[in-house]
């Protein structure tokens, strides 16, 4: 199985769930950028302090700062396989990630696109019951995904790295399809 993966897909497609399952089964390190940011802040590292100051102002953490955190994590893995989830979110970030991986003598082996119909995504996200998950907010998040993140599909497809996995059905059914596509 591939050892350096990237997950992309719309909110509610099950990226976090499937990433956790795959990493546990295959001994990969799950690098979720949201979790990495929170971990750096909790640890009080220099990068964490910088990220915390930005987040406390209600601003988005810069691409450079996220890249620095990703670099730090990848360097610490000493060759262990990884799955990157939540970054890159746009083509500019993907273009910035490539030279970083080159410096570390690593590369993305496969990009997994979890695909799902919008109506199913909306139903899933509403069923989670999060306070900020109302239908208009969810539809706005899907639109932001289409504008910013969806161009990554073409970017990675042009590089021959993209595989699509149907993310409809049960968690187990999706995992089965995912495992088969990565075999």
UniProtKB/Swiss-Prot annotation:
Gene3D superfamilies: P-loop containing nucleotide triphosphate hydrolases. Residues 127-133 are annotated as: LID. AMP binds at residues 33, 38, 59-61, 86-89, 93, 130, 141. It is an enzyme of class 2 (transferase). GO terms for molecular function: adenylate kinase activity; ATP binding. Pathway: Purine metabolism; AMP biosynthesis via salvage pathway; AMP from ADP: step 1/1. It catalyses: AMP + ATP = 2 ADP. Keywords: ATP-binding, Cytoplasm, Kinase, Nucleotide biosynthesis, Nucleotide-binding, Transferase. GO terms for cellular component: cytoplasm. NCBIfam families: PRK00279.1-3 (NF001381), PRK14527.1 (NF011100), PRK14531.1 (NF011104), PRK14532.1 (NF011105). Consists of three domains, a large central CORE domain and two small peripheral domains, NMPbind and LID, which undergo movements during catalysis. The LID domain closes over the site of phosphoryl transfer upon ATP binding. Assembling and dissambling the active center during each catalytic cycle provides an effective means to prevent ATP hydrolysis. HAMAP family: Adenylate_kinase_Adk. This is Adenylate kinase. It comes from Synechococcus sp. (strain WH7803). The gene is adk.
């Amino acid at each position: 199985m591939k050892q350096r993966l990237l997950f992309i897909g719309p909110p509610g497609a099950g990226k976090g769930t499937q990433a956790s399952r795959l990493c546990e089964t295959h001994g990969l390190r799950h690098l979720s950028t949201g979790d990495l940011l929170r971990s750096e802040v909790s640890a009080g590292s220099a990068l964490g302090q910088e990220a915390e100051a930005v987040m406390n102002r209600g601003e988005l953490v810069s691409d450079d700062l996220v890249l620095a955190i990703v670099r730090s994590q990848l360097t610490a893995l000493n060759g262990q396989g990884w799955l990157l989830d939540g970054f890159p979110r746009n083509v500019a970030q993907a273009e910035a990630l490539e030279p970083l991986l080159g410096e570390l003598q690593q590369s993305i082996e496969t990009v997994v696109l979890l695909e799902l119909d919008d109506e199913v995504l909306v139903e899933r996200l509403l069923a989670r019951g999060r306070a900020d998950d109302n239908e208009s907010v969810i539809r706005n998040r899907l639109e932001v995904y289409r504008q910013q993140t969806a161009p990554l599909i073409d970017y990675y497809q042009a590089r021959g790295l993209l595989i699509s996995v149907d993310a409809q059905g049960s968690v187990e059914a999706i995992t089965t399809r995912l495992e088969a596509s990565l075999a």
